[in-house]
Amino acid sequence: MIGRLRGIILEKQPPVVLIEASGVGYEVQMPMTCFYELPDIQHEAIIFTHFVVREDAQLLFGFNSKPERALFRELIKVNGVGPKLALAILSGMSAQQFVTAVEREEIAALVKLPGVGKKTAERLVVEMKDRFKGMHGDLFASDAPFALTSEMPKETANDAEGEAVAALTALGYKPQEASRMIVKVGKPDADCETLIREALRAAI
């Protein structure tokens, strides 16, 4: 099982990053809340991973910290929540925001996440609340707002918007809904990551 990667970032196509470790390139899917914090292309990164094996694919999901990975692993234990939905949940909310929403039983906030209906939101509250009791409360102590740690190369407006829509679609939003979310941001000159971040913020 692949649990950790340390290597050079070759490509960043939200929500997927290509990282080269020991001469091998690994495609890793990451929640956008983690993706924002990655260094620039050609810089070194350390990613904690969860490896999923299916009949038709082998998938790597990556996180910037062990607590974030631990939360992901608890999420996919919930009935009806697979890796893709867990990724979407942690893209729409930071780990701390999700923990807070569950502890306060904020169903209305949870149903705004892609793929999460009322029944799934209620299930998340019931099952995850019990799971949190067995986890250290200080694991998700940071409640800092989303922030990019480095400047990204500017794409053209059309490229940035297209990539942002594609990323939101990959996270579970319908194409038309994703397009509306990006248009609603109202920042035609923004880069792809900024568009995604602002769109997800507005959705919650």
Curated annotation (Swiss-Prot):
InterPro entries linked to this entry: DNA_helicase_Holl-junc_RuvA_I, Hlx-hairpin-Hlx_DNA-bd_motif, NA-bd_OB-fold, RuvA, RuvA_2-like, RuvA_C, RuvA_C_sf
Spans annotated as Domain I: 1-64
Gene3D superfamilies: 5' to 3' exonuclease, C-terminal subdomain (1.10.150.20), DNA helicase RuvA subunit, C-terminal domain (1.10.8.10), Nucleic acid-binding proteins (2.40.50.140)
Cellular compartment(s): Cytoplasm
Pfam families reported in the protein's UniProt record: HHH_5, RuvA_C, RuvA_N
Region Flexible linker, annotated ranges: 144-155
CDD domains with a match to the protein in the record: UBA_RuvA_C (cd14332)
One GO location term (cellular component): Holliday junction helicase complex
GO-annotated molecular function: ATP binding; four-way junction DNA binding; four-way junction helicase activity
Main location class: cytoplasm
Keyword DNA-binding part of the UniProt annotation: yes
Region of interest (Domain II), residue spans: 65-143
DNA-binding found in the keyword field: yes
Keywords assigned by UniProt, alphabetized: Cytoplasm, DNA damage, DNA recombination, DNA repair, DNA-binding
Region (Domain III): 156-204
Family the UniProt entry places it in: Belongs to the RuvA family.
Function statement: The RuvA-RuvB-RuvC complex processes Holliday junction (HJ) DNA during genetic recombination and DNA repair, while the RuvA-RuvB complex plays an important role in the rescue of blocked DNA replication forks via replication fork reversal (RFR). RuvA specifically binds to HJ cruciform DNA, conferring on it an open structure. The RuvB hexamer acts as an ATP-dependent pump, pulling dsDNA into and through the RuvAB complex. HJ branch migration allows RuvC to scan DNA until it finds its consensus sequence, where it cleaves and resolves the cruciform DNA.
Domain notes for this protein: Has three domains with a flexible linker between the domains II and III and assumes an 'L' shape. Domain III is highly mobile and contacts RuvB.
Official protein name in the record: Holliday junction branch migration complex subunit RuvA
Encoding gene per record: ruvA
